[in-house]
Every structure is written in structure tokens, then in C-alpha cells.
Amino acid sequence: MSAAEEDLIDYSDEELATTEAPAPAAGANGGVKGDSGNLTVSGNAAAAKKGSYVGIHSTGFREFLLKPELLRAISWCGFEHPSEVQQVCIPQAILGTDVLCQAKSGLGKTAVFVLTTLQQVEVVAGETSVLVMCHTRELAYQIRNEYQRFCHFMPDVKIGVFYGGVPISKDVEVLKNPETHPHIIVGTPGRLNALVRDKYLRLNSVKVFVLDECDKMLDQIDMRRDVQEIFRATPPQKQVMMFSATLSQEVRPICKKFMQNPLEIYIDNETKLTLYGLQQYYIKLEEREKNRRLNELLDELSFNQVIIFVKSTVRATELDKLLRECNFPSVAIHSGVSQEERIKRFNDFKDFNKRICVATDVFGRGIDVNKINLAINYDLPPDADSYLHRVGRAGRFGTKGLAISFVSNEADQEVLKAVEKRFEVALPEYPEGGVDSAAYTKTD
């Protein structure tokens, strides 16, 4: 096959680790965008500064004047009222405004760009109207599934997902046939850049360009380079939207280089991004005590589903094996598993066939499994933002949840201090008598 197959970038867990502060992005099509006209939203409308934009707080999705097919799908999916980020974003986004949005995990950011792009998509055979990029295969797969749910009553719209780990020939076959060529493409930067470079994918008809978990993609030099190359292959005039739960002051100017006078939305102050229904604790212990303490927690806690984060693929494999030997219904998801097997395991977990998932940070961002109400940091992440994304897997969409972090060395203690400082919270030690299940389980 082409050179694309040989040097296809597949971002591993190690490559997804936090890097140094990035250098400014190189000039892309459209040039460097100015800040004039930027609109900022605070989660507290009363605290919004003079001149800031206060969103249209709708009582229902119908006020957004969406297509009837979309309104039917929203109702069919069981949604009644938009979240705060949806109330603020969607009315402006469907008008073609560039959007830079930070909102806490679990508040419906994905639905913002899915609904907006389905509202705007142009169905032309053999042409791609919408391009969505994210940093992991699992997240791409999940976003594709969200598109399929919301376009249930739009049968003419074709959705495609492209990522590494599967033969590129399958992607080429889909793209070459006008009957199967997707109008909306979701994918990872490495595979998409390979397809663009070898001219299998042409992006000259793209009207909307979306980055989900944008800080992660623009914070890594290799991934940012891929994003820039793909961006240059799209028309200068297009809508650009970027979303994440964490947008540092350093990464925001880089994001805005891709945009023209974006609507900037920061739901809640950036220092207060933890979820309201999420109870958070830490446990001090020795490294050798982790397995025993984990077993005790899994026995005593009343969880629906739990995700356990570790720092490497080897530890994920070994811990999963240990849990299964102890008769816990566990599955491991990390970059050391083939793509086909990863998707199978992800579906097993999401479909509630498995209640325990051991994962690396490849599963730490954007993955949405509604039944997770317990997140355990078996190994703490290296920084505060990664901590937020991890614990955000529990207690999504305002539901209750519990997060417990093991602290076994000085480095862990420093991370804990960084979390408390960054998000202005005081994380208590896990109580000797445990936690009342009513604090982290849904009550009817």
C-alpha cells in the first residue's frame, strides 16, 4: 500500500502523556485570527463581565429551531431539556459562529457539535461536509455512535469513522465509492492525515471543522502538526469549533489561531471544574498495599460500574488478570490491545456485560458510559488536568459519583496538592467507616 500505511501515526498511551507547554501553532489557512469581537460566557450569568455574551437559556430544544428530524431524534433519545453549555452554544453555532468551549465533563459538549453539524450538513454524493477530529480511537468510535443516534431520522446522511489500527485499504474503499463516501467524517489525526496526504480523502468541500478534546491535540507537537496539515487541506472559509473540559490560558491563544472571532464559552470558572455530584477522596498507602485495598473497596462499595486507572499498559494487563482471578467481572482497555479487540471490550463494558474496566489514560478523556459511578486512581496521573478528565468519567450529566485516589509516594502527594490548588478544593481522606452509598448512587 502507500507510504501512509508504513508511517501511520498511532498515538499510544505514552504519547498521550502531558508534554511541555507547546510552541505557537504555525500559520494555517486564513492566517492568525484576532481577538476582537470575542464573546465570553461565565457559568454564572450574574457574574458575567460587561460586554460579555450571555446565552439564550432555552426551556427546550424546540426553541433552537432545529430540523424536525433532529427534534424527533432528540425526543427518541430521551432528552427533554438542553444543558447549560447546549443552551449557550447551539443558538450561535447553528448560525455558523466559530466556537471555543470549555465545560465540565459530562455536560453534553458532544451533543453541541453533533446537533449543530447535523443541522448544517450538506448531503452531496462523494463530498464531505463536516470533519470531526479527536485524539483516540475509542473517542472517535463513540462520537460516530452519537452521530448515528441523532441522525436516526436522517437516513440520507452517511457517517464515517477513520482511525489507526485497522487496514487503510478499508478506508480507501469507502472513500472511493460515492455511494458510501461519508458526508460527516470522524477520525484521529494520524489516519486522516495519511488519507489526505495520499489523496484518498479530499476536504475541499468541508464547511465545518471540529476538534474534540482540543487541548490534548494541540498540546502535543506531533498531533498538532497533523491537525495543521489537515486544516490546511480544508477551505479557508469554514466554521471551526473546539471543545474540552480543560482549556488552560496557554492553549487558548493556540486554539484561536484556527478561528475567526470565536464565541468563547467557559462554563464555570476554570478553577472550579469538578462535578457537583461527585464525591472525591484519597487513600494513603504503600505500593504493595494497593491490590488488597482495591479488593476491599470493590467488595464494600455499591457501584454500578467502575473504571480503574493505571499508568501503563503492563499494569493494566496484570491488574485485570488479577481481578479476574478474584472473580471480578473485569476487562482491560489500553493501546497494547488490537483495535478490533479494544472496540469489542469497550462495547462489552458500555453494554454492561462487564462492570469493571481497567484502563490507561487512553480511556481518560471524553469516553461516556452512563452507568459509571465509581472512578479509582490506582495510579495517580502526572497532572491536575488529567485527574479532572479521569474522575469526570463518574458522575456524568449531573448524576452522583465517587472518585478515590491511591496516594503511595511523594510524587502522588504533589499531584494531589496540584489538584487542590488548581481546582480550589480540599480532597479529604477516605473515611475509616467508608462512605454512605446514598452519596454516590442514584436514588429514585
Swiss-Prot record:
State the span of motif (Q motif): 59-87
Residues reported in the UniProt entry to bind ATP: A103, K104, S105, G106, L107, G108, K109, T110
> For the motif DECD box, what are the positions?
212-215
Write out the catalysed reaction. Answer: ATP + H2O = ADP + phosphate + H(+)
The record's section on PROSITE patterns has: HELICASE_ATP_BIND_1, HELICASE_CTER, Q_MOTIF
Return the EC number: 3.6.4.13
The answer on whether this UniProt entry bears the keyword Protein transport reads: no
Concerning InterPro entries, the annotation shows: DEAD/DEAH_box_helicase_dom, Helicase_ATP-bd, Helicase_C-like, P-loop_NTPase, RNA_helicase_DEAD_Q_motif
What biological-process GO terms show up in the record?
mRNA 3'-end processing; mRNA export from nucleus; mRNA splicing, via spliceosome; subtelomeric heterochromatin formation; transcription elongation by RNA polymerase II; transcription-coupled nucleotide-excision repair
What is the annotated localization of this protein?
Nucleus
Q: Which GO terms describe its cellular component?
A: chromosome, telomeric region; spliceosomal complex; transcription export complex
User: Which SMART domains does the entry mention?
Assistant: DEXDc (SM00487), HELICc (SM00490)
Q: Where is the Helicase ATP-binding domain?
A: 90-265
Please list the residue ranges annotated as the Helicase C-terminal domain: 277-438
Domain of life where this protein originates: Eukaryota
Major localisation: nucleus
Top enzyme class: hydrolase
Q: Which UniProt keywords apply?
A: ATP-binding, Helicase, Hydrolase, mRNA processing, mRNA splicing, mRNA transport, Nucleotide-binding, Nucleus, RNA-binding, Spliceosome, Transport
Q: Which Pfam families match?
A: DEAD, Helicase_C
Instruction: Give this protein's Gene Ontology molecular function annotations.
Output: ATP binding; ATP hydrolysis activity; mRNA binding; RNA helicase activity
**UniProt similarity note:** Belongs to the DEAD box helicase family. DECD subfamily.
- Job description of the protein: ATP-binding RNA helicase involved in transcription elongation and required for the export of mRNA out of the nucleus. SUB2 also plays a role in pre-mRNA splicing and spliceosome assembly. May be involved in rDNA and telomeric silencing, and maintenance of genome integrity.
Please give the record's comment on domains.
Answer: The Q motif is unique to and characteristic of the DEAD box family of RNA helicases and controls ATP binding and hydrolysis.
Question: What's the name of the protein?
Answer: ATP-dependent RNA helicase sub2
- Organism of origin is Sclerotinia sclerotiorum (strain ATCC 18683 / 1980 / Ss-1)
Q: Which gene encodes it?
A: sub2
